[in-house]
Amino acid sequence: MNTNVPIFSSPVRDLPRSFEQKHLAVVDAFFQTYHVKPDFIARSPGRVNLIGEHIDYCDFSVLPLAIDVDMLCAVKILDEKNPSITLTNADPKFAQRKFDLPLDGSYMAIDPSVSEWSNYFKCGLHVAHSYLKKIAPERFNNTPLVGAQIFCQSDIPTGGGLSSAFTCAAALATIRANMGKNFDISKKDLTRITAVAEHYVGVNNGGMDQATSVYGEEDHALYVEFRPKLKATPFKFPQLKNHEISFVIANTLVKSNKFETAPTNYNLRVIEVTVAANALATRYSVALPSHKDNSNSERGNLRDFMDAYYARYENQAQPWNGDIGTGIERLLKMLQLVEESFSRKKSGFTVHEASTALNCSREEFTRDYLTTFPVRFQVLKLYQRAKHVYSESLRVLKALKMMTSATFHTDEDFFTDFGRLMNESQASCDKLYECSCIETNQICSIALANGSFGSRLTGAGWGGCTIHLVPSGANGNVEQVRKALIEKFYNVRYPDLTDEELKDAIIVSKPALGTCLYEQ
Amino acid sequence: MDYNKRSSVSTVPNAAPIRVGFVGLNAAKGWAIKTHYPAILQLSSQFQITALYSPKIETSIATIQRLKLSNATAFPTLESFASSSTIDMIVIAIQVASHYEVVMPLLEFSKNNPNLKYLFVEWALACSLDQAESIYKAAAERGVQTIISLQGRKSPYILRAKELISQGYIGDINSIEIAGNGGWYGYERPVKSPKYIYEIGNGVDLVTTTFGHTIDILQYMTSSYFSRINAMVFNNIPEQELIDERGNRLGQRVPKTVPDHLLFQGTLLNGNVPVSCSFKGGKPTKKFTKNLVIDIHGTKGDLKLEGDAGFAEISNLVLYYSGTRANDFPLANGQQAPLDPGYDAGKEIMEVYHLRNYNAIVGNIHRLYQSISDFHFNTKKIPELPSQFVMQGFDFEGFPTLMDALILHRLIESVYKSNMMGSTLNVSNISHYSL
């Protein structure tokens, strides 16, 4: 596996599939806007998560894949004394933006109180700038970054990793523009710096999106691990006898803007799982480590609790190393402990009850857990969230085990077995993590009734995209699933959709290549 | 939170940027270089610095060179600066003590500039109510849109609190308490601190600035002026000890005539709500308490705003909300109400709103400039938007004007008057006087 972000250049050869048609269009659009040709294009794909939702920020592994839709940033470098960035979006709903770069080499200010599309570019620019200051401090500590004209074009649906792909492409574009053609950045570095990019707009996320976008490989799913070190391992799908494996990605068209709903959804879940980890640690008298390097884990997480528990009670001083058999055993134990600790409070914990469970005052609890990101809630549902995280992590290991060692008597065995895990994941997301919505559930029901073997939400949820495991090829069900979704969901829920919109709402995809550069 | 969404229309206008002339921008020191300049830098498509004035032209020339203001000209006299047609907006960022003597002739000279549309003055407007009223009249006669930097109104926490109150999340307000710490007015004075801020009459003190910004924020959040007030002002620390940068005493005592304590009580016009407020000077005690607390109690919930210093307008606050509100389901745009919303209408909702990376010193001024730009370019496509408006009052949109400043100055004048007379004053007409 190549460890560096790949670079392609003309003449056109071996381009990733999804890029072949689009790069010409974005160059044309760039020329129409700025009347010059771009120097390069930074590309980052969207992603779907096969299984393993909302466990990455607890440092559990996930099984995503990059898909055939992407964010393209075409860039023309400007060598000016007063450098500025001009951003144009192919979608006219997102207005052009222009801002100057600080002349003294300080960081661009990002206002986290405003929901604004160019802020995601600024996040990518910020983390790239931070990286450049580390690798070349004499050059970047006191002088500005170079200016640029940038055209941004994307067909990634909301919920399909759009914001993460944008920050990855923006970071890569910034590094390429400032370090020149011959500089190679490793996938590991790009993933590491972009994993925290969205924190600068107040969105707390875990890094899985960025890892998938960067590490994606054609025809492979990725097994993304966060501990002990961030690592993405491609796994080829099993070779089946009479079918191919395809994924139908159906967009609910419910737009859950991560920034605006974070206080009741995403940010709140992060706090709930953190509080759950600390409540378990208090109950079983173990100390959770504090990871200062990663602001997601300042107060420990559910994986930390698992490791601490096994160190104290099972004499396993070494943290879990990712081994499948050991992991399954430990996760089953964790689920047992969650039942023992939280099942009497399935209706949720008030602030008073949560602080009591942590042996601290309400004021300490509020200061330590609630002021990191905006949040809004009635009760903290520690039982449901902890159970989801551990059981979902268990399903990921079972899925990986299935992909690596199982043999199937018939193709249907694979589809049935893998599909069951996906369906269990959807049930857990809906009932325990409460990140589904009516539209997601409707789409899953319709797909399952018409040929999908596994259907679930993908991405953060609360709208966005769904993913469906469907046999393709001569005997496949892809077209059947598509038609059923159109007739029973889209025509009912969104009767005014145009054919173009329908085409964009349902994507049939195989795994795609990750982030790359295309030199003009 | 609709009010914090950026306009969906372009803020890269097809028209030319607003050309800004500064009185008081110095690259080496001062408030403008820390706040106004970085704010404008983030809005470079909408604002461009084209002129600088300082009594010593060398200061302006050095600033232009250091900041690389390639479009800016240094002017030797106030008259030539004010007369220049290269300026659309003038920003006054100098000591309050000089406001009157600079702004009055500037407005007169500016009659030679047909392009002047905006006058932006730092709070406080001037040293006294009389001066503030004179400036207000002169600006109104000159015919410019005015802005006062009561930038706390643009804080995302204040806007969120205002939103929660206006949408009924705390029901009707029944009481309010404020406690704050005003910083420089205690037993010690840094030797580098400018002398004028410790002398009464220069327009900068615990009442005009610390109390002024905070009480304006309170009125704005609650959408109410006061009906009655009672205040006591103290100068219990008439001498201060000088200290160096490391906090060591220099053995020298200097006089202080500005107040170090304020006790303020009042009732809001809306709902006859009692408000109690105390401010004190001195070194903040970070270990034991917050140095700014605003508590707003309602029939259905409570709001608390906390800050590390008594300057709400430049602090990264934390907003806490706790309360009940029926039929409150968080919905994504266009989403139908879920069958099982997961919210129990009878249970208490808790919200904690804090943005860890928000730089309030620059951010609130930046959002003020953004509002000016939105107004100038009509980025929200408001039909028949007037070219000028008199005051923001309690609107979410727009920006505070000299009329808003004048109303606040009247309240502050009443604080001193109440202290002197030792009586409760009726201030319910404070926003009604015509000039």
Curated annotation (Swiss-Prot), chain A:
List the InterPro entries: Galactokinase, Galactokinase_CS, GalKase_N, GHMP_kinase_C_dom, GHMP_kinase_C_sf, GHMP_kinase_N_dom, Mevalonate/galactokinase, Ribosomal_Su5_D2-typ_SF
Acetylation is among the record's keywords: yes
Regulation: induction: The GAL3 gene is a member of the family of galactose inducible, glucose-repressible genes (which include GAL1, GAL2, GAL7, GAL10, GAL80, and MELI).
User: What are the UniProt keywords, alphabetically?
Assistant: Acetylation, ATP-binding, Carbohydrate metabolism, Galactose metabolism, Nucleotide-binding
A Gene Ontology annotation in the biological process aspect, one of them, is: maintenance of protein location
Q: Which GO terms describe its cellular component?
A: cytoplasm; cytosol; nucleus; transcription regulator complex
Q: Which residues cross the membrane?
A: none
Q: Which GO terms describe its molecular function?
A: ATP binding; galactokinase activity
Question: Which sequence positions carry the modification called N-acetylmethionine?
Answer: 1
Q: What else is known?
A: Present with 721 molecules/cell in log phase SD medium.
The record describes the protein's role as: The GAL3 regulatory function is required for rapid induction of the galactose system. At normal induction, galactose in the presence of the GAL3 protein may lead to the induction of the GAL genes, including GAL1. Then the galactokinase protein (GAL1) in the presence of galactose may reinforce the induction leading to a higher expression level. Upon depletion of galactose, the inducing activity of the galactokinase protein may decrease, after which transcription of the GAL genes, including GAL1, may decrease.
Q: Which PANTHER family match?
A: GALACTOKINASE-RELATED (PTHR10457:SF7), MEVALONATE KINASE/GALACTOKINASE (PTHR10457)
Family statement: Belongs to the GHMP kinase family. GalK subfamily.
Which named protein is this? Protein GAL3
Species of provenance: Saccharomyces cerevisiae (strain ATCC 204508 / S288c)
Question: What's the encoding gene here?
Answer: GAL3
UniProtKB/Swiss-Prot annotation, chain B:
- An individual GO BP term: negative regulation of transcription by RNA polymerase II
- A GO MF label: kinase inhibitor activity
Which Gene3D superfamilies does the record cross-reference, listed alphabetically? Dihydrodipicolinate Reductase, domain 2, NAD(P)-binding Rossmann-like Domain
Record bears the keyword DNA-binding: yes
Residue(s) carrying N-acetylmethionine: 1
InterPro entries in UniProt: Gal80p-like_C (IPR055080), Gfo/Idh/MocA-like_OxRdtase_N (IPR000683), Gfo/Idh/MocA_oxidoreduct (IPR051317), NAD(P)-bd_dom_sf (IPR036291)
GO CC annotation, single: transcription regulator complex
Report keywords, A-Z: Acetylation, Carbohydrate metabolism, DNA-binding, Galactose metabolism, Repressor, Transcription, Transcription regulation
Task: Indicate yes or no for the key word Phosphoprotein.
Answer: no
Q: What is the protein's known function?
A: This protein is a negative regulator for the gene expression of the lactose/galactose metabolic genes. It binds to GAL4 and so blocks transcriptional activation by it, in the absence of an inducing sugar.
Other noteworthy facts: Present with 784 molecules/cell in log phase SD medium.
Q: Which family does it belong to?
A: To K.lactis GAL80.
Oligomeric state and partners? Monomer.
| Protein's name according to its UniProt entry | Galactose/lactose metabolism regulatory protein GAL80
Q: Which organism is it from?
A: Saccharomyces cerevisiae (strain ATCC 204508 / S288c) (Baker's yeast)
Provide the organism lineage as a comma list. Answer: Eukaryota, Fungi, Dikarya, Ascomycota, Saccharomycotina
Q: Which gene encodes it?
A: GAL80
